[in-house]
């Protein structure tokens, strides 16, 4: 049996449509960025003999959407397209576990493990290409932010102690080269009418 319309007493074969809000993906983009930083291992921390392990995490602290610019390009099949930018700020939280030299003979060395933790700030931007204009009311979401590769170089060596092996060199500085990849998307909240079931 159909329900009765409360206002006019007329049978209502379908329930009224409802409006829902859904996030719609307008576009996606990604960026690779090389971060270079020089770290100094200063007293009371001992100098570095060898790096044992490195833990790292990319943290995005802020993402700002820049309004888009519209283009007409023949290489897009004559269709208009928009290019927007996202300004990104963040840091890389990095922990280095390293060996140092405390005692030595003319053939070998020994010493404890130490850890060195630092935060490497970065600022960059990525581009997002869309088929429609992006507005200030649209939102940007970070899909992923990861370290894709890294390299640590030891430099600023100390003199080798007398009677120690010639390879027992410790270093006061680390040059860090970190390649990060950030992926983001732009979403817009749109209203849709749906027909609920009985």
Regions found by a protein language model. Give the residues of each.
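Viral structural modules
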Residues: 1-198
């Amino acid at each position: 049996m159909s329900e009765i319309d409360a206002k006019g007493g007329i049978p209502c074969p379908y329930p009224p449509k409802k409006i829902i809000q859904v996030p719609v993906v307008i576009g996606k983009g990604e960026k690779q960025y090389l971060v270079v930083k020089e770290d100094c291992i200063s007293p009371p921390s001992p100098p570095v003999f060898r790096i044992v392990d490195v833990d790292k995490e990319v943290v995005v602290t802020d993402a700002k959407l820049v309004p888009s610019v519209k283009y007409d390009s023949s290489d897009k099949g004559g269709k208009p397209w928009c290019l927007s930018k996202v300004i990104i700020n963040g840091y890389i939280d990095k922990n280095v576990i390293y060996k140092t030299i405390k005692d030595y003979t003319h053939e070998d060395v020994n010493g404890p493990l130490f850890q060195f933790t630092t935060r490497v700030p970065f600022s960059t931007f990525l581009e997002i290409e869309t088929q429609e204009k992006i507005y200030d009311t649209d939102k940007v979401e970070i899909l992923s932010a990861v370290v894709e590769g890294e390299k640590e170089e030891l430099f600023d060596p100390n003199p080798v102690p007398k009677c120690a092996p010639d390879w027992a060199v410790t270093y006061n500085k680390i040059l860090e080269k970190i390649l990060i990849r950030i992926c983001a998307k732009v979403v817009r909240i749109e209203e849709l009418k749906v027909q609920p079931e009985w």
